[in-house]
Protein backbone atom coordinates (compact mmCIF):
# COMPACT_ATOMS: atom_id res chain seq x y z
CA UNK A 1 0.00 0.00 0.00
CA UNK A 2 2.30 2.80 1.24
CA UNK A 3 6.02 2.76 0.65
CA UNK A 4 8.87 5.16 0.23
CA UNK A 5 10.60 8.01 2.04
CA UNK A 6 9.65 11.65 1.61
CA UNK A 7 11.24 14.74 3.14
CA UNK A 8 8.45 16.86 4.63
CA UNK A 9 8.33 20.53 5.62
CA UNK A 10 5.79 21.72 8.18
CA UNK A 11 4.63 25.32 8.11
CA UNK A 12 4.29 27.61 11.14
CA UNK A 13 0.81 26.22 11.83
CA UNK A 14 2.04 22.62 11.86
CA UNK A 15 0.54 21.77 8.49
CA UNK A 16 2.25 19.35 6.13
CA UNK A 17 1.46 18.43 2.56
CA UNK A 18 0.67 14.74 2.10
CA UNK A 19 2.64 13.58 -0.96
CA UNK A 20 0.47 13.63 -4.08
CA UNK A 21 1.23 9.98 -4.82
CA UNK A 22 -0.77 8.95 -1.72
CA UNK A 23 -3.68 11.40 -1.85
CA UNK A 24 -5.93 9.49 -4.26
CA UNK A 25 -5.46 6.27 -2.31
CA UNK A 26 -6.22 8.03 0.99
CA UNK A 27 -9.30 9.64 -0.57
CA UNK A 28 -10.61 6.27 -1.78
CA UNK A 29 -9.73 4.29 1.34
CA UNK A 30 -10.55 6.79 4.01
CA UNK A 31 -12.48 9.78 2.62
CA UNK A 32 -9.41 12.01 3.10
CA UNK A 33 -9.11 11.15 6.79
CA UNK A 34 -6.04 9.90 8.63
CA UNK A 35 -5.62 9.00 12.27
CA UNK A 36 -2.46 10.20 14.00
CA UNK A 37 -1.08 8.52 17.08
CA UNK A 38 2.19 7.93 18.89
CA UNK A 39 4.60 5.18 17.95
CA UNK A 40 4.98 3.33 21.26
CA UNK A 41 8.27 1.73 20.21
CA UNK A 42 10.31 4.64 18.84
CA UNK A 43 10.86 8.11 20.26
CA UNK A 44 10.74 10.81 17.62
CA UNK A 45 8.06 9.09 15.54
CA UNK A 46 4.30 9.29 15.02
CA UNK A 47 2.05 6.85 13.16
CA UNK A 48 -0.56 7.83 10.58
CA UNK A 49 -3.26 5.33 9.61
CA UNK A 50 -6.10 5.42 7.12
CA UNK A 51 -9.30 5.28 9.13
CA UNK A 52 -10.28 1.67 8.35
CA UNK A 53 -6.85 0.28 9.28
CA UNK A 54 -6.85 2.41 12.42
CA UNK A 55 -10.22 0.99 13.45
CA UNK A 56 -8.79 -2.54 13.14
CA UNK A 57 -5.74 -1.63 15.26
CA UNK A 58 -7.84 0.25 17.82
CA UNK A 59 -10.42 -2.53 18.15
CA UNK A 60 -7.73 -5.19 18.52
CA UNK A 61 -6.01 -3.20 21.25
CA UNK A 62 -9.16 -2.24 23.14
CA UNK A 63 -10.33 -5.85 23.65
CA UNK A 64 -7.18 -6.59 25.62
CA UNK A 65 -7.67 -6.64 29.41
CA UNK A 66 -6.42 -3.32 30.75
CA UNK A 67 -5.66 -4.76 34.16
CA UNK A 68 -2.13 -5.24 32.81
CA UNK A 69 -0.15 -2.02 33.02
CA UNK A 70 1.55 -2.43 29.63
CA UNK A 71 -1.83 -2.89 27.92
CA UNK A 72 -3.27 0.14 29.70
CA UNK A 73 -0.27 2.29 28.73
CA UNK A 74 -0.55 1.17 25.10
CA UNK A 75 -4.28 1.94 25.09
CA UNK A 76 -3.62 5.39 26.54
CA UNK A 77 -0.72 6.16 24.23
CA UNK A 78 -2.28 4.87 21.01
CA UNK A 79 -6.04 5.29 21.43
CA UNK A 80 -6.35 7.96 24.10
CA UNK A 81 -3.85 10.23 22.38
CA UNK A 82 -5.00 9.66 18.80
CA UNK A 83 -6.22 12.50 16.59
CA UNK A 84 -8.46 12.36 13.54
CA UNK A 85 -6.99 14.52 10.77
CA UNK A 86 -8.59 15.47 7.47
CA UNK A 87 -6.77 16.48 4.31
CA UNK A 88 -7.74 20.00 3.29
CA UNK A 89 -8.32 21.15 -0.30
CA UNK A 90 -4.55 21.60 -0.72
CA UNK A 91 -3.74 18.06 0.42
CA UNK A 92 -2.45 19.18 3.83
CA UNK A 93 -3.01 17.81 7.30
CA UNK A 94 -2.50 19.76 10.49
CA UNK A 95 -0.33 17.88 12.98
CA UNK A 96 -1.37 18.91 16.52
CA UNK A 97 1.29 20.83 18.43
CA UNK A 98 1.04 18.38 21.34
CA UNK A 99 2.10 15.52 19.07
CA UNK A 100 4.81 17.55 17.32
CA UNK A 101 6.39 18.69 20.56
CA UNK A 102 6.21 15.23 22.16
CA UNK A 103 8.39 13.76 19.41
CA UNK A 104 10.43 16.91 18.63
CA UNK A 105 9.11 17.44 15.10
CA UNK A 106 9.97 20.94 14.00
CA UNK A 107 9.92 22.35 10.48
CA UNK A 108 11.65 19.33 8.93
CA UNK A 109 10.34 15.78 9.09
CA UNK A 110 10.48 12.50 7.20
CA UNK A 111 7.42 10.53 6.09
CA UNK A 112 7.92 6.80 5.57
CA UNK A 113 5.35 4.63 3.83
CA UNK A 114 5.33 1.41 5.86
CA UNK A 115 2.73 -0.73 4.12
CA UNK A 116 -0.43 -0.32 6.17
CA UNK A 117 0.56 3.00 7.78
CA UNK A 118 2.92 5.94 7.61
CA UNK A 119 5.63 6.83 10.07
CA UNK A 120 6.24 10.55 10.58
CA UNK A 121 9.70 11.11 12.03
CA UNK A 122 11.50 14.17 13.25
CA UNK A 123 14.36 14.72 10.83
CA UNK A 124 16.93 14.33 13.62
CA UNK A 125 15.45 11.10 15.02
CA UNK A 126 15.21 9.57 11.55
CA UNK A 127 18.81 10.50 10.77
CA UNK A 128 19.96 8.96 14.06
CA UNK A 129 17.99 5.78 13.34
CA UNK A 130 19.55 5.44 9.89
CA UNK A 131 23.05 5.99 11.28
CA UNK A 132 22.46 3.42 14.02
CA UNK A 133 21.07 0.89 11.55
CA UNK A 134 23.96 1.36 9.12
CA UNK A 135 26.58 1.00 11.86
CA UNK A 136 24.88 -1.96 13.56
CA UNK A 137 26.69 -5.06 12.35
CA UNK A 138 24.19 -7.44 13.94
CA UNK A 139 20.64 -6.91 12.72
CA UNK A 140 19.48 -10.11 14.36
CA UNK A 141 18.67 -13.65 13.38
CA UNK A 142 15.22 -12.67 12.18
CA UNK A 143 16.70 -11.42 8.93
CA UNK A 144 18.78 -14.50 8.13
CA UNK A 145 16.16 -16.08 5.87
CA UNK A 146 15.14 -12.82 4.18
CA UNK A 147 16.06 -12.60 0.51
CA UNK A 148 16.85 -9.00 -0.37
UniProtKB/Swiss-Prot annotation:
UniProtKB keywords: Cytoplasm, DNA-binding, Repeat, Transcription, Transcription regulation
PANTHER family: TRANSCRIPTIONAL REGULATOR MRAZ
CDD domains: MraZ_C, MraZ_N
Name under which the protein is recorded: Transcriptional regulator MraZ
SUPFAM superfamilies: AbrB/MazE/MraZ-like
Family listed: Belongs to the MraZ family.
GO CC field: cytoplasm; nucleoid
Gene3D superfamilies: Transcriptional regulator MraZ domain
Keyword Magnesium applies: no
Subunit structure: Forms oligomers.
A GO term for molecular function: transcription cis-regulatory region binding
GO BP field: negative regulation of DNA-templated transcription initiation
HAMAP family the UniProt entry points to: MraZ
Residues in SpoVT-AbrB domain copies: 5-53, 82-125
Keyword Cytoplasm assigned: yes
Subcellular location as annotated: Cytoplasm, Nucleoid
One Pfam family it belongs to: MraZ
Amino acid sequence: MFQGETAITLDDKGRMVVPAVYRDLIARMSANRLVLTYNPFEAGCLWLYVEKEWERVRDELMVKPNAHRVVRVLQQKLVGSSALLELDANGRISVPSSHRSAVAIGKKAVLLGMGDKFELWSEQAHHALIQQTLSDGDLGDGLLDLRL
